[in-house]
UniProtKB/Swiss-Prot annotation:
Cofactor: Zn(2+)
Annotated function: Catalyzes the attachment of threonine to tRNA(Thr) in a two-step reaction: L-threonine is first activated by ATP to form Thr-AMP and then transferred to the acceptor end of tRNA(Thr). Also edits incorrectly charged L-seryl-tRNA(Thr).
Region Catalytic: start-end pairs: 242-533
CDD domains: TGS_ThrRS (cd01667), ThrRS_anticodon (cd00860), ThrRS_core (cd00771)
Gene Ontology MF terms: ATP binding; metal ion binding; threonine-tRNA ligase activity; tRNA binding
Compartments, as annotated in UniProt: Cytoplasm
Coiled coil: none
Protein known as: Threonine--tRNA ligase
Domain (TGS) ranges: 1-61
Gene Ontology BP terms: threonyl-tRNA aminoacylation
E.C. number: 6.1.1.3
Cited PROSITE patterns: AA_TRNA_LIGASE_II (PS50862), TGS (PS51880)
Amino acid sequence: MVSIRLPDGSIRQYEHPVTVAEVAASIGPGLAKAALGGKLDGELVDTSALIDRDASLAIVTDKDADGLDIIRHSTAHLLAYAVKELHPDAQVTIGPVIDNGFYYDFSYHRPFTPEDLEAIEKRMQELAKRDEPVTRRVVSRDEAVSYFRSIGEKYKAEIIESIPASDEIKLYSHGGFTDLCRGPHVPSTGKLKVFKLMKVAGAYWRGDSKNEQLQRIYGTAWTKKEDQDAYLHMLEEAEKRDHRKLGKQLDLFHIQEEAPGMVFWHPKGWTLWQRVEQYMRRRLDAAGYLEIKTPMIMDRSLWEASGHWQNYRENMFTTESEKRDYAIKPMNCPGHVQVFKHGLRSYRDLPLRYAEFGSCHRNEASGALHGLMRVRGFVQDDAHIFCTEDQINSEAIAFNKLAMSVYEDFGFDRIDIKLSLRPEQRMGSDETWDHAEEGLRNALKACGLEWEELPGEGAFYGPKIEYHIKDALGRSWQCGTLQLDMMLPERLGAEYVAEDNSRRRPVMLHRAIVGSMERFLGILIEHHAGAMPAWLAPFHAVVLNIAESQAEYAQTVVQSLQKQGLRVSADLRNEKISYKIREHTLEKVPYLLVVGDKEREAQTVAVRARGGVDLGVMPVEAFVERLREDIQAFK
């Protein structure tokens, strides 16, 4: 007798061992048809999995997130099947699920073309319509190696050879195609209805640039066509909002080959940068932070003491001078500890909050660089709080409130918060970890925030809160961090005099709100599609004259506005006014002020807001009042 507990708490009993598919069929024909897999005692399994013991079971359908993963995984195998049918000489390697889809890497003697992708996708559709059953068999490692070598799949054989000899190997087959996989997979290819191949990119075998170069075909798969259509529309919108394209269009920045991963900021882009930095500086000052500046290049001995030299050296830029080794700092924390150590600290000095817009450099792989989002040289809104264990909760509460307020001001109102908890290998006592984790939990609770807990995901030296902001397209970006550190103060010898005159180590809270300034500006540009709120925009307004006779008045308007602290320029070119309006509209300037003879005589301006909204004619001071209302909240 096998007893199976279902998600609603009910128990079904069977005389003999049953498969997941048979359990689904016993519940109802609709569920049997919809079943993609099962969750057996928390583990994802195929519908063909045999249950021969008492267990809990949830039937997985396309309404579940796990169901979508199964569909995407199976579609990756369908892709490999289609490629092998059309290009028998291609060698298959790996094909995992990724966010919003999947990819599969192939070794082939020539590049896949867009026409190839069309043909492959068409063949995938044909194979799916055949509704071929997907079967699983378990074999020994040696048997699997022998099989893949016999059909010329050397990459698959190499993967299997790296698996312990005692492990069982799962092979999945549909039609004439067999692949190595942990599974689970859909019961038949007919379940794969909505998919699209997206692009081809380069990759390396096992991710190592020293190995053979492969071709990676990316695809997306969904349960419903409308979901895929929405995703494809989002990608189209994302392409329009690409910060690299807008950076060029709006003349904000550029990156060139002579300085890979380093940004050349143009005047408008640097104005945007300054608006963000000055805003952050005001917020930090009001929150009790002390701004400092630490050296960019420091001796190897400091990086050895901090542990970076041993654990992070391959990501650091190093240099040598007068027989001494130096590193360009990849992060600011060791320097902040040096400032804390410079002088005797008392418990009365704590909490001590040091902030720095610190310039850091990391030797990122050239293939990973991506506009402002992944660079080698960047500035962080970095700060470190030195406090006692008893102050963790209050400092975390203050930081949560500050971070959420900042995100709101920048236009982000959807924030996902994740709390990473103690890993198995860690420093410090369980009591210390209990205190630290509970302090962060209570801080989130006190701020009325919801969060997801990630057991085992914390660093070995302390728990961490991550702040993931969602942009206008629903994409998630991890920006803010609050990392509790019980290690670095000890490694670098930071201490304070406690109330009983003993020497104690402070707790160190690493924290950032925007993170990398470059990356945050890239996110901002894409979130607002380049149309920055007036308080952030490089220019608040541009004054346009209709004819040369109004040029002097236009200049007078500009000077008047500039004297009041507004960022305004004039376009006095001898061009048609429609041409000038179109040009500055494309530059996404918040306000265009048009002046003709009537406006000059009446000492007024005709105001056009972004988006072509005609606000009518008004005195200059009335416009100033309107603009100040627009930006006042962030001054």
